[in-house]
Amino acid sequence: PILLPYHTDERLSFPRKSFSTLITLSRPLLDRMEIIEVSGYSVNEKLHIAKEHLVGKQLRKNGLATSLLKISDSALKHIILGYTKESGVRELERQIAKICRKAVTKLYEAGVFNADGTRNKEVKVCIRITDKNLTDYLGNIKYKTDKAYKKPQVGIVRGLAWTSVGGETLEIEVNAMPGSDDLRLTGNMGDVMKESAMIAYSYVRAITESGKYKVDMKYFDEHMLHLHIPEGAVPKDGPSAGVTMTTAMLSAVTGIPVRPDVAMTGEVTLRGRVLAIGGLKEKLLAAKLAGMKKVLVPEENVSDVEELDAEITDGLELVYVKDMSEVLNNALVL
């Protein structure tokens, strides 16, 4: 209704419910529902919504004229990236409201308002919010975007993940060390992700023992791999990190570094095929924010990319891959 002032709401004969995530819904309930997925907003879309609707709405609610408080585009973008972590704009509106409330206090102290709340027109003051003074109103930044490494790394690969609050980059680390265990997994992984890790491990053993990469045949008898995904307090699951895990393991085993400006997503099979994934729009947006230059995408997702707006893929080199050999050729510094 905010974005479509002339929208007519026709009441339907069945109930409609909205959810931020389907994970917590029971399977019998899901079987009786038609699921309509709505993608999250991009940074530019959030910026447009804030400028055209949210700022004006909060100015009116707090009794402020546009001549008294101005929020720059750069400040709004900093709020979106540094003070919110969501697919929508609810928290963004809360942060704008917080700025307005603090601005009212400062304006009152400056004599802009009389004791009865009326405007003192003799005092001419305008508060301008920029990215330079934003912390005075909202405090320190809450969220920081992980940026790409400057140099190639061994055993560290940047994957892409979909969450209920949008896309995120997912750093996967693998260390190879002397030991008798095959594979150790840490990082609060779900069952599906653990299975993906085991598939990746089996694939890496198969291609290294076949002689494609120079690894001693006794290597896996004498070494173990430890795979970790940082932010251990955050649960993680799903198969789309398969290609990332495989690349990180092979890099750790062979000592071949991985390009720091490459991100990837895709499910992998035991034979190295790369399968389609979901949440591609959000994942690509996360890759752009992290400063990635190249993104490896399953070839089966070509049709999904064609449906995306150009602004989402601008600045990204998308490489479609159908198997792990293509992933490794694009990711490893050979």
Q: Could you say what each language-model-derived stretch is?
A:
Residues 119, 125-126, 144-149, 153-158, ...:
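Peripheral, non-AAA+ core regions of ATP-driven protein-machinery
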Residues 37-39, 228:
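Conserved beta-strand segments of the P-loop GTPase G domain that flank and frequently precede/overlap
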Residues 22-31, 39-97, 102-122, 207-218, ...:
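Conserved C-terminal "switch" segment of AAA+ ATPases
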Residues 2-21, 69-71, 221-223:
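AAA+/SF3 P-loop NTPase mechanochemical coupling elements
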Residues 72-174, 180-186:
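Conserved catalytic-core segments of large NTP-driven translation/proteostasis enzymes
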